[in-house]
Amino acid sequence: MGNCHTVGPNEALVVSGGCCGSDYKQYVFGGWAWAWWCISDTQRISLEIMTLQPRCEDVETAEGVALTVTGVAQVKIMTEKELLAVACEQFLGKNVQDIKNVVLQTLEGHLRSILGTLTVEQIYQDRDQFAKLVREVAAPDVGRMGIEILSFTIKDVYDKVDYLSSLGKTQTAVVQRDADIGVAEAERDAGIREAECKKEMLDVKFMADTKIADSKRAFELQKSAFSEEVNIKTAEAQLAYELQGAREQQKIRQEEIEIEVVQRKKQIAVEAQEILRTDKELIATVRRPAEAEAHRIQQIAEGEKVKQVLLAQAEAEKIRKIGEAEAAVIEAMGKAEAERMKLKAEAYQKYGDAAKMALVLEALPQIAAKIAAPLTKVDEIVVLSGDNSKVTSEVNRLLAELPASVHALTGVDLSKIPLIKKATGVQV
């Protein structure tokens, strides 16, 4: 098993080792690589720009003047596979500071050697050429280390014996002298030239004034001619414009009339269409619904009529059936009552006095209830008699009057019934 290692574009990943003593090396930057456990080794080296500041102090030039020179260099490890392999071979495992020290010492050595071949003026006055020369000389050496010089510039040049300042003062004095001479000659030439220019200016001015006057006179004459011609053309154009305007107005009016006629025809057609639409709308919204409503009402009336007829027929049939049923009931009741009366009569004839006695006994409770009805309102009855035999005689008197009362109420003569006769002791 192993691990997947990733690396950004500012670093290079070096994977070495492998199975069976393999010496294959893989260089990756801005990507990923696979490394086996225990048998593969992974290391990283920076590809970022390194800023160096080489400094050479008191280095004698070709003229023997001691100068101190400082510069700024931008270097980085190259990413070409062969050069990256060279750089990894020499710097892998070292930190950035160690790499910078190696390159810095190389640049300072070349800078010292080049200073010894140039004069102070060449170094001071043409710094770009001096820096270019350093780059060209140092580039092959650092290139063999896998390092690329991106830029190299001279930062400062100075000395401790004021050679540069003296050189500057001398040059400044020469320049100042030449400047004063140049100013005097320029002022002299300027005065002469100014006078000549004034003379030429006056000559030119006089000639110009003459030409201006001639041109002005010719201009006024030409202007008058042009004005007259313009007025004529203007009048003709105005007349032609008015005539053309009148013709155009006539055409416009004619077209307006034609447009009005067409619009009126279209309006008439639209009104006719509107009348047809309104008629159809009235038919659809008023007439058809009214006809439908009338038809619906007619159907409802006919249905109601049929309903009432059927209801009347049903009611008549109902009344007839009820009448027939009631008549049948009355007839059955009459027949039953007649049969009952017939059976009673036969029973009375068959059983004689016993039947009559049963009839009397059946009627007696009703009679007693009618007789006793007034007594229900009496709280108590007090019999006043000084003799016990008097009470007995009163009871016998009431019993003796009972047959007459029954005969009056029912038409039955109890005195003719032997059992009652014996009980009451009535003599016929």
UniProtKB/Swiss-Prot annotation:
Biological process, per Gene Ontology: anterograde dendritic transport; cell adhesion; epidermis development; negative regulation of amyloid precursor protein catabolic process; negative regulation of gene expression; positive regulation of canonical NF-kappaB signal transduction; positive regulation of establishment of T cell polarity; protein localization to plasma membrane
Membrane topology field: Peripheral membrane protein; Lipid-anchor
Phosphoserine: residues carrying this PTM: S405
Keyword Phosphoprotein annotated: yes
Tissue specificity: In skin, expressed in epidermis and epidermal appendages but not in dermis. Expressed in all layers of the epidermis except the basal layer. In hair follicles, expressed in the suprabasal layer but not the basal layer. Also expressed in melanoma and carcinoma cell lines, fibroblasts and foreskin melanocytes.
Main location: membrane
SUPFAM superfamilies, per database record: Band 7/SPFH domain
Keyword Heme annotated: no
Keywords from the named record: Cell adhesion, Cell membrane, Endosome, Lipoprotein, Membrane, Myristate, Palmitate, Phosphoprotein
GO cellular component: acrosomal membrane; adherens junction; basolateral plasma membrane; caveola; cell-cell contact zone; cytoplasmic vesicle; dendrite cytoplasm; endocytic vesicle
Location in the cell: Cell membrane; Membrane, Caveola; Endosome; Membrane
PTM (free text): ZDHHC5-catalyzed palmitoylation predominantly occurs at Cys-4. ZDHHC5-catalyzed palmitoylation may be required for the formation of higher-order complexes and for neurite outgrowth in cultured neural stem cells.
PANTHER family: FLOTILLIN-1-RELATED, FLOTILLIN-RELATED
Family: Belongs to the band 7/mec-2 family. Flotillin subfamily.
Record text on subunit structure and interactions: Heterooligomeric complex of flotillin-1 and flotillin-2 and caveolin-1 and caveolin-2. Interacts with ECPAS.
Protein name as catalogued: Flotillin-2
Phylogenetic lineage: Eukaryota, Metazoa, Chordata, Craniata, Vertebrata
